[in-house]
Curated annotation (Swiss-Prot):
Superkingdom of origin organism: Bacteria
Listed GO biological process terms: ribosome biogenesis
UniProt keywords, alphabetically: GTP-binding, Nucleotide-binding, Repeat, Ribosome biogenesis
Function per UniProt: GTPase that plays an essential role in the late steps of ribosome biogenesis.
Entry protein name: GTPase Der
Positions with a binding annotation for GTP 1: 9-16, 56-60, 119-122
Family from the record: Belongs to the TRAFAC class TrmE-Era-EngA-EngB-Septin-like GTPase superfamily. EngA (Der) GTPase family.
Domain spans labelled KH-like: 352-436
CDD domains (UniProt xref): EngA1, EngA2
Molecular function, one GO term: GTP binding
Length: 441
């Protein structure tokens, strides 16, 4: 396992900017609105001598009556409990605050390496105006400017030295990456918390409470997974705030990172137009897909109700006939075990490779039983097929008229491959090439 480093501190002291600087890319949302990073956010960092996981937390307010800020405080405490090293960030422009002092007193009781940072120190003049911070009585204080990359490299040199030795980095290939997507407030965060057995993501009845995509590693039945709880994808017309627009982009990026996507649908509201668009993102990205119908416990059901809901999904999501459907209640835990069973099954098919001989046996039979329509009055001839990739399964078919294969015939070929080999839960990619490309296949 990679060692973990947690960044904690009051809201708006620059934690997310520091997170982005260390990661080397824009991973967390940065905005001037206090509390914009509501949950912990994880990123793998490989830029330094020791690979590690960096945790960005929501702002830490020691005493508050605001329920959301209280939840963010609890999440910060969980992050500190998980971490191997803690970076406590203070604001050099605001000066030392009573909240900073209270957090430092709490950190004194934590038995792990802690680095105290004064952020937003952009020059020597500011460096001389931070005397109050030295009254904290800590051994070393680092002055940095995360925005301008001042002092960050020196800080990281010392942080790397403090990381536990012998922590082997896990490669992405060893981990099944699962993205949880859906409209705001369909129960994604509650579902994630149930799967993990811990209040990992702030679950709040306010739609859009989860704004960033939140990453969590976990183990189930001796298999490792990375669970990505994405911000709810809203209609474009509703993403009026700059921060919400970035959340949609972040969710789409999370889909790109995933192997398997859980498409969460609200059983109470049924299938909406926005659900079909969200699922379309996953399909276009070529990810393994599973429908998770949540809040199934809230409906009055008869023996036919589940069948009717399945028919509705199949009708509205005609491009995903291969995706399994699981009916669950994240609130009660009903049928949640079925989700991981389906994830494993879909992942196996997502990464499946078929031998060229088996592929062509099915392909030849399919083309002989049903010829392709004529193209510009000429017959479309097929030569052979070969699988060139996985995740998703990708197959090249060599033909005399690569531009003459009708989409309906392409769908027919895909269906024949599915009948023979399964490929449950995963899209398939067919690429038609001219005969002259055969040697390059």
């Amino acid at each position: 396992m990679r060692p973990l480093i947690a960044i904690v501190g009051r809201p708006n002291v620059g934690k997310s900017t520091l997170f982005n600087r260390i990661v080397g890319r824009r991973k967390a949302m940065v905005d001037d609105m206090p509390g914009v990073t509501r949950d912990r956010n994880y990123a793998n960092v490989d830029r330094f001598d020791v690979p590690f996981i960096l945790i960005d937390t929501g702002g830490f307010e020691p005493e508050t009556n605001d329920r959301l800020l209280q939840q963010m405080r609890e999440q910060s405490q969980l992050a500190m409990a998980e971490a191997d090293v803690i970076l406590f960030v203070m604001d050099g422009r605001d000066g030392l605050t009573p909240a900073d002092v209270e957090v430092v007193e709490m950190l004194r009781r934590v038995d792990k390496p802690i680095f105290y940072l004064i952020n937003k120190i952009d020059g020597d003049k500011q460096e001389t105006a931070i005397g109050d911070f030295y009254t904290l009585g800590v051994d070393t204080i680092f002055t940095v400017s995360a925005e301008h990359n001042r002092g960050v490299n020196d800080l990281m040199d010392e942080v790397i030295k403090a990381l536990p030795k012998g922590s082997a980095a896990d490669t992405d290939e060893e981990v099944t990456k699962i993205a949880v997507i859906g409209r705001p407030n369909v129960g994604k965060s509650t579902l994630v918390n149930r799967l993990l057995g811990i209040e990992r993501v702030v679950a709040n009845p306010t739609p859009g409470t989860t704004r960033d995509s939140i990453d969590t590693y976990f183990t189930c039945n001796r298999k490792r997974y990375l669970l990505i709880d994405t911000a709810g994808i809203r209609r474009k017309g509703k993403t009026t705030e700059k921060i919400e627009k970035y959340s949609v982009v972040d969710s789409l990026r999370s889909i790109e990172r995933a192997d398997v996507v859980l498409i969460v649908i609200d059983a109470e509201e049924g299938v909406t137009e926005q659900d079909t668009k969200i699922a379309g993102y996953a399909y276009e990205a070529g990810r393994g897909c599973i429908f998770v119908v949540n809040k199934w416990d809230t409906l009055t059901k008869d023996n036919a109700s589940m069948g009717k809901f399945i028919e509705k999904i199949r009708m509205e999501f005609k491009y995903l006939p291969f995706a399994p459907i699981v009916f669950v209640s994240a609130k009660t835990g009903q049928r949640l075990g079925k989700i991981m069973t389906e994830v494993d099954a879909v992942m196996e098919q997502f990464a499946r490779r078929i031998t060229t001989s088996d592929l062509n046996r099915v392909f030849s039979t399919a083309t002989e039983e049903h010829h392709a329509p004529l193209y510009q009055g000429r017959r479309v001839k097929f030569y052979f097929a070969t699988q060139v990739g996985t995740k998703p399964p990708s197959i090249v078919i060599f033909t005399n008229r690569p531009d003459g294969v009708h989409f309906s015939y392409e769908r027919y070929i895909v269906n024949r491959f599915r009948e023979a080999f399964g490929f449950t839960g995963t899209p398939m990619r067919l690429l038609f090439k001219g005969r002259e490309s055969r040697k390059r296949a």
